[in-house]
């Protein structure tokens, strides 16, 4: 075959780009036929706004199509600029709303495969479904859908490749004898603005009792330095009574981390300094003895590396929490939206037993989750207790690794894509 096959991938949040798209694109190196990769980014209330920029940095991706062009193509059939379909291809859903992937497949007349957490709507539009764990398959009740669903493992595990070992990181960070605390304030703008200030204030409280504690912030590639500065002076900082400033590397920064690239440093009024790092999250996770994080991809990645974590979700201002689907549209209604969200968010939260992936997978609490009207003092108290219990941290780390499973899911997904492509275009394709 001389003409490359189109691989159309839908993905639309920071966690999906880093935890799903990147390992799948890497695994496509073994794909049986020549191909071009087109990433469509549908609309998403959780988008950071930087998805297109980050995806464009992935060398194997031929073209990125943003939300507006995606919707135009689906609704009107208007081709995105520079996008010329090959006539043969496959649509792969990795995140967002299945509706967009289903309509893209229909518009292009390509078969489709979906990797989901149990969702199987638009089932007739998909040749196959792939899921990470058996309990996700059990959520479905349609025998026909179950028959075309495969459990392949968690693709996020294939993304985790620390640049340094824990021992090397301890040496580079200069804390061979002291514990390390990693802050992961998220990548979505609304979350980051609120949680960075919350976690920095929490560190102030912890350092007052554990002055030798080493700390670091992993700044998502989806977050800019401008957003970092804004988060330290915005309403989140005012809410928690935080007085802190950000200093880019080389501008009065006191931290050194060997060959690690330090983005800058956060300095608080009380004298606490926290180094910030970009693009080195797995090395930092491997370094940490404990991580403070919000729910999401991070919880799987930390668990895979055996790093204990403390999840916190302050719902002190539920009107600021982004919501999916109809609830998200309702929340955006002028004047009434925020009042409705103040009522909706606590109700949604009450229905969720666990938010951290390791706890969801285990069906019980392995790592603590602090949710609701919470404050930095409370999180600091729990974190100090965990940090002082070295044997407890070690046991939690071992349990976390067992729960999330083994890597290799990305390659198993590629095998499914090959099966679907082979059965659809068997006359025109040879291995």
Question: Across the structure, where does each feature detected by a protein language model lie?
Answer:
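Nucleotide-activated sugar donor-binding and catalytic core shared by glycosyltransferases
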Residues: 1-431
């Amino acid at each position: 075959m001389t003409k490359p096959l189109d691989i159309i991938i839908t993905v639309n949040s920071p966690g999906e780009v880093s935890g799903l798209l990147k390992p799948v694109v890497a695994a496509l190196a073994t794909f049986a036929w020549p191909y071009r990769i087109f990433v469509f980014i549908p609309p998403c209330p959780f988008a950071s706004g930087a998805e297109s920029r980050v995806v464009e940095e992935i060398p194997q991706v031929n073209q990125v199509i943003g939300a507006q062009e995606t919707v135009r193509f689906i609704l009107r059939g208007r081709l995105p600029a520079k996008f010329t379909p090959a006539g043969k291809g496959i649509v792969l859903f990795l995140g967002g709303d299945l509706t967009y992937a289903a309509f893209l497949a229909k518009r292009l007349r390509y078969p489709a495969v979906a990797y989901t957490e149990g969702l199987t709507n638009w089932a007739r539009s998909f040749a196959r479904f792939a899921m990470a764990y058996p309990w996700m398959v059990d959520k479905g009740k349609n025998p026909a859908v179950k028959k075309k669903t495969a459990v392949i493992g968690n693709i996020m595990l294939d993304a985790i490749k620390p640049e340094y070992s824990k021992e090397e990181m301890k040496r580079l960070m200069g804390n061979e004898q002291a514990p390390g605390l990693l802050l992961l304030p998220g990548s979505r703008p609304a979350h980051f603005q609120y949680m960075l200030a919350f976690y920095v204030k929490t560190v102030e409280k912890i350092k007052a009792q554990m002055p030798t504690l080493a700390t670091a912030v992993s700044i998502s590639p989806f977050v800019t330095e401008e957003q970092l500065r804004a988060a330290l002076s915005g309403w989140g900082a005012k809410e928690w009574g935080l007085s802190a400033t950000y200093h880019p590397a080389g501008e009065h920064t006191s931290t050194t981390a060997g060959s690690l690239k330090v983005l800058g440093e956060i300095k608080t009024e009380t004298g606490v300094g926290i180094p910030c790092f970009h693009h080195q999250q797995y090395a930092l996770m491997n370094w940490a003895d404990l991580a403070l994080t919000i729910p999401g991809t991070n919880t799987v990645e930390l668990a895979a590396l055996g790093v204990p974590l403390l999840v916190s979700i302050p719902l002190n201002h539920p009107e600021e929490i982004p919501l999916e689907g109809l609830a998200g549209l309702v929340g955006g209604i002028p004047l009434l939206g925020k009042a409705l969200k103040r009522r909706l968010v606590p109700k949604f939260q009450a229905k969720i037993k666990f938010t951290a992936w390791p706890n969801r997978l285990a069906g019980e609490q392995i790592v603590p989750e602090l949710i609701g009207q919470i404050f930095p003092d409370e999180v600091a108290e729990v974190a100090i207790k965990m940090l002082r219990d070295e044997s407890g941290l070690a046991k939690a780390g071992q349990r976390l690794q067992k729960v999330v499973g083994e890597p290799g899911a990305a390659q198993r997904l590629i095998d499914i894509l090959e099966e679907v492509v082979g059965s659809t275009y068997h006359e025109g394709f040879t291995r």
